[in-house]
A protein has these predicted regions:
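Basic, Lys/Arg-enriched alpha-helical interface segments
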Residues: 1-65, 80-83
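Enriched for short, Lys/Arg-rich terminal
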Residues: 68-95
């Protein structure tokens, strides 16, 4: 399976990582490690690594989300044919 990243994905990760670095370098490193772990999990098993995107009134089966374990973020991705597309890292809440 071919893995593609949205062009903004690395910038988004670096932005959130630098925000955590303002608090603690260790926290930033843990955030980055968890992002890398989630991407590895998605790549190894894209159909079971995350769950369908639920928009409240509709479930979008073409898109999946993989929640990070220790941080309030998820990775949005999709599988189409032989391609895995990693789209975005998104904050789960805004506080």
């Amino acid at each position: 399976m071919r893995v593609l990243f949205h062009p903004d994905f690395p910038k988004e990760v670096r932005k959130f990582e630098s925000d955590y670095a303002l608090v603690s370098q260790g926290l930033a490193a843990r955030f980055r490690s968890e992002i890398d772990e989630a991407i590895k999990s998605i790549t190894l098993s894209p159909n079971s690594a995350g769950h369908f995107l639920n928009l409240g009134s509709a479930v979008v089966r073409e898109l999946r989300r993989r929640n990070l374990r220790a941080f309030p973020f998820f990775i949005l991705y999709g599988v189409t044919g032989d391609r895995l597309i990693i789209g975005a890292v998104i904050a789960s809440r805004s506080d």
